[in-house]
């Protein structure tokens, strides 16, 4: 578990729940994080686990939901060479719910179908509404560009600048909408491929305000010493020389440029 809270590393954690034990606690460079390794036995029942953090006389309690794990026979079959895969950028496919086109409080607050880099309004409901069309074309798998929230100032339509890894972008819909699409696809013998980006995150991910470790980002020192006005010119960009990863004779500068360089200034390389 990743736990964030003000000076949380000063607290001791206690869990009194049948089948769960704290194996190890890892402190970060920032005092506001704890990384907790848990052992959960196979017989542990689902329920609300109370995480108790104590420091002298002060105690913090957080209710953590332990959900029912899907059994092996419920796990989805992976895609393979027999599949015909259709890649969808959800924002560009179909608008099934006009009420979520603009969400108050998010940084990008416009729809403009005349602008290639603006949002166009497509969503999960739009894909679900057109499942027959996709099936009739013979596709057996749908690969969606990431649908997790991208709360960026611009260019958020593509989904590759995640700002919260646990929240569906509300402009695409809700978790219930995602599960509904999964159910509809399954009923039509269509697989749903989840795309998730862990190489980098969006510039406005919440941990960017308080990085857990001194090496959480590649070229972190350059980022910390940059401002909004200088980040673009200071960024060390990826050279995209992919062959250097396999090339035993590649120059170290080329290897690191590929491995650690940033894609763009708005997507910090993790």
Feature-to-residue mapping (PLM):
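Substrate-binding/active-site clefts of carbohydrate-active enzymes
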Residues: 93-140, 145-270
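Short, solvent-exposed loop/linker segments at beta-strand-coil boundaries, enriched for Pro/Gly
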Residues: 17-24
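Aromatic sugar-binding surface patches on proteins
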Residues: 28-37
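Low-complexity, Pro/Ser/Thr- and charge-rich linker/hinge segments at domain boundaries
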Residues: 66-87, 92, 96
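Conserved structural position at the C-terminal beta-strand
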Residues: 53-55
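Beta-strand/beta-sandwich contexts
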Residues: 1-9, 68-70
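Short, surface-exposed loop/turn segments at beta-strand-coil junctions that are enriched for proline
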Residues: 39-45
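Edge beta-strands of extracellular beta-sandwich domains
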Residues: 48, 59-68
């Amino acid at each position: 578990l990743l736990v964030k809270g003000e000076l949380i590393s000063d607290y001791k954690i206690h869990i009194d729940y049948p089948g769960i034990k704290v194996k190890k606690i890892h402190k970060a460079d920032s005092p506001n994080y704890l990384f907790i390794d848990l052992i959960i036995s196979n017989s542990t029942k689902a329920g609300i686990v109370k995480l108790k953090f104590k420091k002298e006389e002060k105690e913090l309690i957080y209710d953590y939901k332990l959900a029912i794990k899907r059994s092996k026979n419920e796990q989805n079959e992976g895609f393979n060479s027999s599949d015909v895969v259709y890649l969808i950028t959800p924002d560009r496919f179909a608008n099934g719910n006009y009420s979520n086109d603009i969400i108050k409080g998010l940084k990008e607050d416009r729809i403009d179908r005349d602008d290639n880099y603006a949002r166009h309004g497509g969503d999960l409901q739009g894909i679900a509404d057109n499942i027959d069309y996709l099936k009739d074309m013979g596709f057996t798998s749908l690969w969606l560009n990431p649908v997790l929230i991208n709360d960026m100032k611009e260019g958020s339509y593509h989904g590759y600048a995640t700002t919260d890894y646990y929240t569906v972008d509300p402009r695409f819909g809700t978790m219930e909408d995602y599960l509904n699409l999964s159910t509809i696809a399954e009923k039509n013998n269509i697989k749903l491929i989840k795309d998730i980006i862990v190489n980098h995150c969006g510039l406005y991910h919440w941990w960017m305000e308080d990085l857990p470790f001194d090496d959480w980002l590649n070229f972190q020192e350059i980022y910390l010493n940059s401002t909004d006005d200088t980040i673009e010119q200071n960024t060390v960009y990826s050279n995209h020389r992919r062959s250097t990863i396999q090339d035993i004779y590649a120059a170290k500068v080329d290897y690191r440029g590929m491995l650690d360089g940033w894609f763009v200034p708005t997507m910090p390389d993790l």
